[in-house]
Amino acid sequence: MAQEKKRRRFAVCLAAYNGMVFMVEQIESILLQSNVDIQVFISVDQSIDGTEARLAEWALSESRLTLLPFGQRFGGAGPNFYRLLRDVDLSGFDYLSFADQDDLWHPEKLWRAQCLMTKKSALGYSSNFTAFWPTGEARLVNKAWPQRTWDFLFESAGPGCTYVLHSSLAIPLQQLVRNADKNLLRVDYHDWLAYAFARYHNFPWVIDTWSSMQYRQHAHNQIGVNAGWRSFWLRVRKILSGYGFEQSLLIADLVQASALPVVQRGLGGGRLGYLWLALRATQCRRKRIDQMWFFISCVLLALFKPADRGDA
C-alpha cells in the first residue's frame, strides 16, 4: 500500500493523424510504463485511414485511453498539441507528457523522468533519444548540451515527445495557451514554446543524457532527425528565409520575453541586429556546431535577407 501511494499520475497527450501504420505499437509502449499511473489523452486530426475508428474501438476496452471529440482539421502537429493543452483537464495529475503517434517508449521513460526531476529539483524535463530507420540503422541523438542564456528563444530542449512537465509548470503553460491570441497558431513548434515559457519564467529544466525513447524515422515524419544532405539544405534554406527568427519573435511575444536585449537589439534590430546576434552565438545555441551555424546564418541574413521581408 505504501508503494501505491507513491505512484504519480501522468497525463500523456498524444496527437495523431493517419496513424494506423505505427500508432498501435506506440500506444502499447506507453501503456507499458512502469511505476507510474497514466491516462492517455488523444486528439486526432481528421484522418482517412481509419485512425478514429480504431481508437474508438480500443477505448471501449482500455480505460486509460481518453479520446477528445473527433472531426476537427488542424493541419499540423502544433495546432493539434495546442488543442490538447487547451482542452485536457490537468487537475488531479502530477505531470504532463507529450507523445507522437509513431515512436517507441522505454518502459521506464516516465519513471526515470520523475526520479531525475525530483533529484535535480527540476519542473521541466527532456532527454536524449535514439533515432531508428526501417533499414535497421539506429543512432543516439544527444540533446543534453549545457543550457545557455538565450538558447530557449532559438531552439527547443529536444523533441516534444521526450518532454515531461511538472503540474506546477504545465498548468501555467496551459493558461498561456488558453489565453493566447491567434498568433499562437503561427508558432509551429509546441515543444519550443513550452521550453521557452519554462526557461523565461525560471522553471528549472533538466536535459537527461539517457535515451528515453526510440524516435522513428520515415517518409511521413513532419519533423525528423537532421540527417543527410537533402535534409541539411532544406534547413539551411529555411534559416536563410528568416523563418526561424520569425518563430523566435512570435515565441518571445507569447512568453512575454520581448523586453530582453536579445529580442530588442538582436531579433528586432534589422541587419545590425543579426550581426549583434552573431557575436553572441555561444549564448543562443547549446551545441558547439549549432553555435557555429548560428553565427554563419546571422552573418548571411545581415548581408542577404530580402528587404521586403522587413527587419524582423
Regions found by a protein language model. Name each.
Residues I38-Q46, L68-F70:
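Short beta-strand/loop segment that forms part of the nucleotide-sugar
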Residues G19-L32:
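Short, well-formed alpha-helical segments that are part of the catalytic scaffolds
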Residues F93-D102:
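Short beta-strand-to-loop acidic/aromatic patch adjacent to the donor-nucleotide binding site
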Residues L104, E108-R139:
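Conserved donor NDP-sugar-binding/catalytic core segment of glycosyltransferases
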Residues G71-L90:
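Glycine-rich, basic loop-to-helix element that forms the pyrophosphate-binding segment
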Residues V44-A53, F74:
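A conserved acidic beta->alpha catalytic loop
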Residues A196-Q214:
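Catalytic donor-sugar/metal-binding loop of nucleotide-sugar-dependent glycosyltransferases
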Residues N183-A196:
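Acidic donor-binding loop at a coil-to-helix junction in glycosyltransferase catalytic cores
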